[in-house]
Amino acid sequence: MASQARVRGAVAIAAAVWACAACGSATPVAAQGAVTVHELASGLGHGARVLMIGAHPDDEDTSLLTWLARGRHADAAYLSLTRGDGGQNAIGNELGEALGAIRTEELLAARRVDGARQYFTRAYDFGFSKSVEETLRHWPRDSVMGDVVRVVRAMRPHVIVAVFSGTPRDGHGHHQLSGQLAREVFDAAADTVRWTVRGFGAAWTPQKFYRAARFNAAAATLGFDVGGYDPVRGRGLGELAAESRSQHRSQGFGSAPRRGSVMDYVRLEAVRAGDPSAKESDLFDGVRLPFAAGDAAARRLGDRITALRLALDLRAPWRALPLVDSARVAAEAWCAFGRPASALGDVCRGTVPVPATMRADSADVVLVGVRLLEQLRQLAAAASGLVLEATVDREFVAQGDSATLTLRITNRGPRTARAAIFTPSAQPMPADTIAPGGELRATLPLPRYARTEPWWLVGGRAGDLFAAPAATVDDEVRSDRPVASVPALVDGITVQLRAPITFNRVDETRGEVTTPLAVVPRVSVTLDGGATALARAGAPLVRDVTVRVTGFAQRAESATVALRLPAGLAADRATAPVVLVPGVAQAVTFRVRGTLAAGRHELQATVTAGGRTWSEGFQ
């Protein structure tokens, strides 16, 4: 977004910048240790998928999501219609799109705790809405519904859970609409006449539809204890759910941990699985799951997973690597229907999407297989005793600049390992051995990465819908953060190590501080004064306008700062010279005088350096 000033009402001056959502955010790290190994092994072979649908970040039932993902090991996800752009901010001054970027990161942080995935539609949160009718004046129903259909057809949930009732008692038009669309998509996902395969993906038929009833147990058809205790982790699911909830810091949603029994409730409203008249005892009663098919390949895979679990020693997990690899081979064969070397094998390995022409039951198997193979990859990495760290020499790298990437692989296990590091030209460096207790360090040029920015803000908005198409993959994946990947061998078994690329520094009071690599514009230019400033139309205006300029090139360079003013205003000087020192923010102040007519006007700050002009900034 351009660093511009906008005028509303009489006269309003606002600076708009793109928010660097990943800058300074929590970095997803490669999980290690007994808890991770135990959880990954326990989660193998569970094929149920559940999608919860609400309106905003923090609407989700984190207790239910945590129980589903961490307790039942289901593939659980939350679809939020919005990113919470129109909410309040308890931790800063950011509002609008910038707040939406913050709340997106908070939601992704919550999902890392509770284990679920995260989706969004294109809807921009325009603020409180008194009714669904008012909401639909901002969001065309078919546009938002189309996004919900796309997500459901991509994820293919067996069960859908609506957070809200879809009635006026929800109290917020956004809440009410989310409850309505959740019920509608239960049927619409299979309707290829209105929602074509070409435009919205292959048809899918969810098997059960519930509404959350955690605050109305009397209306529930099913209740369950979501507060179970995990002795390996040493924490209960209720404690994890509270930690997930507490990630919504901008909304002041810090939660106390809940220990012991925690009951949650849902109400069954539609069902296509099992006997609809039978009394339920479980959320998945009657649901047809791929592993339940009982064919020879599924039994073979199930036997290998069982053998792996029984043999796994959390104090020496590397001993189970041959069984992990054996399960991987069986999983590839099961997922690819006996043809792991075929194009379908590439689908199972997650390198290409599931074809829209594939039968629904076959696609169900493949989706479970894709998840299982990724779980086995993570399990092999976590059990190998190898740790990959990928660091850069500075936190901000300007687009087009070079930087140094350092890869360090530490061998904490008792077996000698080998690792092959590929250069940006895809040529491998000579493979090196890593003795127990030793490490391999390699330095190479940082590959070129796209600019670090909230992907949904690219293209701006059309009214209250973002222009960028809604993602049909987990938003963590869609964010496409820079990641290093290195193949290694332990006892002849391939282990794929992955780690986020970070900048690490030591703070005297906090110890090591890790921040994700941010690829930024060569120059960042923003305007002081917040989102909006007002002035009286037709009256003399005298105002200081301060421009904040930061250079991120590797070396200092000379630049000029200028203002592009609306008719009726003039600055005390045409340009101001400045020397851009890498990473140092500087303030340049112009005195603006004149008068403006009533209406909306724009003021833009620009910086010219090295023959190029920039008018964007980030925060």
Segments (PLM) and residue ranges:
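Asparagine-centered strand-capping/turn motif at beta-strand->loop junctions
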Residues: 409-413, 548-553
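Metal-dependent de-N-acetylase/amidase catalytic core
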Residues: 24-50, 131-135, 141-386
